[in-house]
Amino acid sequence: YCSILVKVRDGRPIKIEGNKFSTVTKGGTSARAQGSILSLYDKYRLQNPTVGGKNASWEVVDKEIADQLSAVKAKGGKIKILSSSVNSPSTKQLIADFGTYFGNTELIQWEPISVSAIATANEKSFGKKIIPAYNFGNAWSVVGFGCDFLGSWISPIEFTKQYVKNRKITHDNPVMSKHFHFESRLSLTGSNADVRRVVKPSQEGLAIISLYNKIASKAGASTLSGGSLDSATEKILDEAANHLWDNKGKSLVVCGSNCVSNQTVVNGINNLLGNYGSTIDLGSTINLNQGSDADVNRLVDEMNN
């Protein structure tokens, strides 16, 4: 998500800038937002509807779709609408009206970069299938696992504005937050971390469990079974655990994995640290990514049967 202003010359958009009046992005933009304007001038983009890969008129396409929908309605069949996340109230109302008319209609939301494991993990942990609001501005200790929250994860422009709040040393703010990052490839977020450690994708779950066990030992909670990592990685995890524990309630652990198990353990870490209500708000949700892997998989199964 990015609230923007567009500079126009002779009716043509030529430059994107952030909207400083936005309470979410606060005037920020991203490379993705800046580059999106180029798609308007892509001569290879689709300019007409197509049928079987060939250009067709809107009249032909509309008639064919309407005829097929009417045939499905007459037979009492199912209609699925596959879409990216829908947040517009007017679009939701149109879909609802569509479903009322045709009946037996379901909206399936899908995202190319899925984070549905977060919502599923929160449903398991708290009974709420949501993506909570994260506040990096309240965190003095941040640990990330394969999570490019400054580049591409969920709401990077919003998170960047929050993150830099505690990364600038001033006369009134002489202390800077500390950021540990574990990832398999270099990301924008990892390059800005104070401590960065390369961890194989196959070892990410072990690293998360190791951090959980270190925090659980300090909290007097039960630990989880898991394998061991190399001594250098364990040493950095020890340092991260100590810094997190010293900043209980003012810390944040995030994970970019779309694995429900990993996200559930991360929930446990944040819970032991008392971060809910401070750096994580379950009462305020992020609705940008509403796609559900389970719904898409179910749709594929139904189409194959």
For each feature predicted by the language model, list its residue ranges.
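Generic low-polarity alpha-helical segments
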Residues: 4-6, 142, 270, 302-305
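Short, surface-exposed connector motifs at secondary-structure boundaries
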Residues: 70-80, 246-252, 305
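Active-site phosphate/pyrophosphate-binding segments
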Residues: 195-304
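N-terminal export/assembly segments and adjacent metallocofactor-ligating motifs
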Residues: 1-238
